[in-house]
Amino acid sequence: MTVDKRYYEVAKPGSLSERLMIRARDRIYADFLATCSPKPAETILDVGVSDVLNDGANVLERLYPNQEQITACGLGEATEFQAAFPRVRYRRVATGEPLPFANKSFDVATSNAVLEHVGSRENQARFIAEMVRVARRVFITVPHRFFPVEHHTAIPLAHWTDTTWFLACAVTGKQKWSQDKELILMSARHLSSLVPPGSAHQVGYTGLLLGPFSSNLFLAIT
């Protein structure tokens, strides 16, 4: 199994789940462009690219016209990723280690659906701080806790409270997803609380737009 294949187990190829994921990530890409307005010559760091190649993964690499301006990093060897996107530079990184780039090396840093998997609140704060360190503008997206269906398990509604979430995971045999080391459910308040002090930022809805029940959240730091 590739490093992150388990995160795509719900979205089978050609399924309704995959079609909705593609629609959500296309909107995320549009919001990234609108919020960060990257110019053709500006450099972009994409943190946490996927070893899984499908229409819902690696949206920036699939859609951004200036691929040579992208540096991607991830946990795996990314052999198939590099073959699919030969114009994108790739750096392998280690969990919990600082990003291997100098301060303000990039104009923009982005990360999609990674922050919820880094294991603890402290790790999340460090993850964001590292992105702020290496880039002038930052755009991060995560699944939204209050979307009616939990993204990784397809369990409806139970994830809105910790008690019902733990119970639902136990009943369905999906206990691993109730552990912070696998998944931290993300609300707008929690996401905002992770931002380094003094950083101007905005938290908003993206993905499948349903107001306060939208599928994803974005964090923009400028």
What do the predicted segments below correspond to?
Residues R137-T164:
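Conserved class I S-adenosyl-L-methionine
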Residues L183, R189, P212-L219:
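Short hydrophobic/aromatic beta-strand or adjacent loop that forms the aromatic wall/cage
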